[in-house]
Amino acid sequence: MEYLGGIAGSGTLVQHGKDIARATYDFEGYETKHAGITCCGEIGSSPVVLAAVFGLTDILLRTDTGNLLEIRFSGKTLKPSQDFAHVDVRGEIPGHKREWRRRPGTILAT
Protein backbone atom coordinates (compact mmCIF):
# COMPACT_ATOMS: atom_id res chain seq x y z
CA MET A 1 0.00 0.00 0.00
CA GLU A 2 1.34 3.41 -0.95
CA TYR A 3 0.20 6.64 0.67
CA LEU A 4 -0.61 9.20 -2.03
CA GLY A 5 -1.50 12.24 0.05
CA GLY A 6 -4.60 14.11 1.07
CA ILE A 7 -7.31 16.32 -0.32
CA ALA A 8 -9.39 18.72 1.75
CA GLY A 9 -11.95 21.41 1.16
CA SER A 10 -15.63 22.21 1.25
CA GLY A 11 -18.67 21.12 -0.67
CA THR A 12 -22.35 20.31 -0.54
CA LEU A 13 -24.01 17.09 0.60
CA VAL A 14 -26.50 15.92 -2.03
CA GLN A 15 -29.26 13.29 -2.01
CA HIS A 16 -31.29 12.42 -5.13
CA GLY A 17 -30.06 15.60 -6.85
CA LYS A 18 -31.18 17.84 -3.98
CA ASP A 19 -28.71 19.92 -1.98
CA ILE A 20 -28.91 19.05 1.73
CA ALA A 21 -26.23 21.06 3.52
CA ARG A 22 -22.70 22.39 3.34
CA ALA A 23 -19.87 20.18 4.56
CA THR A 24 -16.11 20.10 4.83
CA TYR A 25 -13.94 17.12 3.95
CA ASP A 26 -10.46 15.84 4.70
CA PHE A 27 -9.56 12.65 2.83
CA GLU A 28 -6.46 10.49 2.46
CA GLY A 29 -5.61 8.54 -0.68
CA TYR A 30 -3.83 5.20 -0.99
CA GLU A 31 -2.89 3.00 -3.91
CA THR A 32 -2.84 -0.78 -3.74
CA LYS A 33 -2.02 -3.31 -6.43
CA HIS A 34 -5.41 -5.00 -6.19
CA ALA A 35 -7.85 -2.16 -5.47
CA GLY A 36 -6.12 0.71 -7.27
CA ILE A 37 -6.63 4.12 -5.68
CA THR A 38 -8.81 4.18 -2.58
CA CYS A 39 -9.86 7.12 -0.45
CA CYS A 40 -11.22 7.60 3.06
CA GLY A 41 -11.39 10.26 5.74
CA GLU A 42 -13.82 12.59 7.45
CA ILE A 43 -16.67 14.87 6.49
CA GLY A 44 -17.75 17.63 8.82
CA SER A 45 -21.09 19.38 9.19
CA SER A 46 -23.50 20.29 11.96
CA PRO A 47 -24.47 17.46 14.33
CA VAL A 48 -28.10 17.80 13.17
CA VAL A 49 -27.16 17.33 9.51
CA LEU A 50 -24.85 14.41 10.20
CA ALA A 51 -27.48 12.68 12.34
CA ALA A 52 -29.97 13.02 9.47
CA VAL A 53 -27.69 11.50 6.81
CA PHE A 54 -25.62 9.06 8.88
CA GLY A 55 -25.92 5.53 7.54
CA LEU A 56 -27.73 6.49 4.34
CA THR A 57 -26.27 4.89 1.23
CA ASP A 58 -27.29 7.47 -1.36
CA ILE A 59 -25.39 10.56 -0.16
CA LEU A 60 -22.98 12.38 -2.46
CA LEU A 61 -20.54 15.19 -1.79
CA ARG A 62 -20.23 17.76 -4.57
CA THR A 63 -16.95 19.55 -3.91
CA ASP A 64 -16.53 23.26 -4.54
CA THR A 65 -14.09 22.26 -7.30
CA GLY A 66 -16.89 20.35 -9.07
CA ASN A 67 -16.05 16.72 -8.25
CA LEU A 68 -18.90 14.39 -7.33
CA LEU A 69 -17.93 11.92 -4.60
CA GLU A 70 -19.92 8.95 -3.33
CA ILE A 71 -19.57 8.67 0.43
CA ARG A 72 -20.27 5.63 2.57
CA PHE A 73 -20.27 5.99 6.33
CA SER A 74 -17.70 3.62 7.78
CA GLY A 75 -18.45 4.17 11.46
CA LYS A 76 -21.01 2.06 13.30
CA THR A 77 -22.38 4.86 15.48
CA LEU A 78 -22.50 8.64 15.64
CA LYS A 79 -22.68 10.55 18.92
CA PRO A 80 -25.49 13.16 19.04
CA SER A 81 -23.05 16.07 19.41
CA GLN A 82 -20.55 14.80 16.83
CA ASP A 83 -19.78 17.24 14.01
CA PHE A 84 -17.71 14.84 11.88
CA ALA A 85 -18.10 11.33 10.50
CA HIS A 86 -15.68 8.80 9.03
CA VAL A 87 -16.40 7.83 5.43
CA ASP A 88 -15.09 5.73 2.56
CA VAL A 89 -15.07 7.61 -0.73
CA ARG A 90 -15.60 6.63 -4.37
CA GLY A 91 -16.36 8.55 -7.51
CA GLU A 92 -14.34 11.40 -8.96
CA ILE A 93 -11.31 11.06 -6.69
CA PRO A 94 -7.90 12.07 -8.06
CA GLY A 95 -6.63 9.29 -10.31
CA HIS A 96 -2.96 10.21 -10.45
CA LYS A 97 -0.31 10.51 -7.73
CA ARG A 98 0.54 14.07 -8.75
CA GLU A 99 -3.02 15.22 -7.94
CA TRP A 100 -2.70 14.30 -4.26
CA ARG A 101 -1.20 16.76 -1.78
CA ARG A 102 1.54 15.12 0.27
CA ARG A 103 1.27 15.78 3.98
CA PRO A 104 4.59 16.29 5.75
CA GLY A 105 5.46 13.86 8.52
CA THR A 106 3.09 11.13 7.36
CA ILE A 107 4.56 7.66 7.62
CA LEU A 108 2.78 4.59 6.31
CA ALA A 109 3.95 1.12 7.18
CA THR A 110 3.62 -1.36 4.34
Predicted segments, located by residue:
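Solvent-exposed edge beta-strands and adjacent loop segments
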Residues: 1-35
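Solvent-exposed residues in well-ordered beta-strands and their adjoining turns
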Residues: 28, 44-46, 90-94
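Noncatalytic linker/hinge segments flanking ATPase motor cores
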Residues: 50-55, 66, 79-86, 101-106
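C-terminal output/interaction extensions
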Residues: 88-110
